[in-house]
């Protein structure tokens, strides 16, 4: 086992604070409407330009082990805030740096770190309650657009496109962000349920212009195994032909004789059918087939529940107003499913989202909810170069998370004003313990730091602006984008309450742990001896 370097007291705490400052100083320059860019070198490809706090934080590793521990703890503040609220990572980092800096003064002066931490925790709890009281609901498209714009570094186009997407697919709908093909941002909305499987044969195409197979008022057959024998399908095909309606077959696969017969029937105009593979794999495939069954009012024909393909009737088939099948996607529009059953299914999936542990599972379950509830919106981010597109995409994703958070817990005045106003809750907070009261004072001063940093990044004088904002009341604050004072909410400078709350809670949590640290242990790097040169190789005998 390698030897360890064990250090104690103020000296090692100072090293930890140095690490905090290096990381926080790199992140804080991105805060506010006039935040600067950070350029990150990449091992492959061009450099990455970003204004996203958590992206900057994740890139930082320091050479000194003790400084690096401090930096990694603040990195945790940024990534935790990002996980919970999706935005506010820079604010959280600035708050953590400020609480640590203020707190260290008191620890060095001989106050009890544990009591300081208790005071900080009590102050944060009071601030969180006050933030809940001053938050107002975020319902209108205009407010959603404003939140999106602020989060995307005052890019109004981004706010507008997110508000439009939310209007079209609902606040619960899935909105994804992709690379665009043009210079402008574009919004694509897929109505109905879409899954990523297309036709199994191009001979099913009946709309040559769009290169899709379009079925009006079709039946939908759902089967969880492969279909290769046409005899299994004949009874149900005959019933569909008598009804004179088209048929979509969704199965694990349709191959061989069965696929050939369907294609021939289609070409001759005997029966309009299209076959596609079922989406997903394994258990997810079964779940998605069940979703489609509920959406279309049919059942999944599965031997597991005692149903067989030969005995299927029209009652087992789902129905829809229209289905469009392309090369890679199938879209079911207006399924004939029962609304109450669809709602029950959505509620069941939401329950699964709450218990899911992995982000991937949550994302897939969220997509299923959106598909059942009515649509998916895709924001295609346009830019002139790949480097610009990456930077823009980061901002759009941040803005999307911020708007979701705003819809969830409401909005407060932006620009660091909400935290200043919430300080009113601390003025009469007395703990009965001098050291804990000092902890409250630490938070009282730290909540000024986001506004100070926003003003500094905009080239203003932080102390002058903070004093002027404190003289005002309510939502009165400083709009760093335009350089004006006034009602922040009326000026459209809004922050989601959830983002402000999580930034404060996570910053205080890690800062409190740092203040109560008295010993740090790191591995001593071993000097590995250089590999000796290989000895000369013996001469080779003459070759014939």
Curated annotation (Swiss-Prot):
Q: Which SUPFAM superfamilies match?
A: GroEL apical domain-like, GroEL equatorial domain-like, GroEL-intermediate domain like
Keyword annotations for this protein, in alphabetical order, are: ATP-binding, Chaperone, Cytoplasm, Isomerase, Nucleotide-binding
Spell out the NCBIfam families in the cross-references: GroEL, PRK00013.1, PRK12849.1, PRK12850.1, PRK12851.1
Catalytic activity of the protein = ATP + H2O + a folded polypeptide = ADP + phosphate + an unfolded polypeptide
Q: Which CDD domains match?
A: GroEL (cd03344)
Describe the function of this protein. Together with its co-chaperonin GroES, plays an essential role in assisting protein folding. The GroEL-GroES system forms a nano-cage that allows encapsulation of the non-native substrate proteins and provides a physical environment optimized to promote and accelerate protein folding.
The record describes its quaternary structure and partners as: Forms a cylinder of 14 subunits composed of two heptameric rings stacked back-to-back. Interacts with the co-chaperonin GroES.
User: What protein am I looking at?
Assistant: Chaperonin GroEL
Look up the EC number in the record and give it.
5.6.1.7
Task: Report the family membership.
Answer: Belongs to the chaperonin (HSP60) family.
Q: Which domain of life is it from?
A: Bacteria
Residues binding ATP are 30-33, 51, 87-91, 415, 495
